[in-house]
């Protein structure tokens, strides 16, 4: 898949960032993500997984804000990963009205709930924080289109894994994406939960 098939605001963002062509693995996975399938996406660092996640999420949300409920939830390991991914999204969405919000393990959960209630499109958070917000009705999943896990190796921690699998139980329909550098038994176990129908995509070398 070339970048020519992306929507105009996203193509303009890529031009501004001087990203001219997809990397080989991105060519392989971008059409699969666009198809709406649930996917395990496994490739080493440097293969372009994070950029593919950002591009695919923005494309799926049509590069524009819509109502107030989040349409994308992205799980990450910790505060540093949440802020880094938020910064990456902000590079692409600088001239769009998409609203990106990172809810990391800061103490004031009531403020985070209010911020999200005011209207966001993409929420980036740790499993613990998202589940805490969900328990106090701080996350409305009725409009959700995509749920992704970035660098899923961190799920070896039981508390992260358990918090993660609880939220999809309340989601009627959305696309699930799990990105990882390598597979491990804990990631494989997601097949027993919300990744039951997922296809495995590995970097072809």
Q: Which positions does each model-derived feature cover?
A:
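Conserved pre-motif I regulatory segment
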Residues: 1-42
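Walker A/P-loop NTP-binding motif
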Residues: 27-39, 49-67, 90
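Conserved catalytic network of the ASCE P-loop NTPase/AAA+ motor domain
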Residues: 32-33, 63-68, 93-95, 114-118, ...
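The conserved Walker
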Residues: 43-47
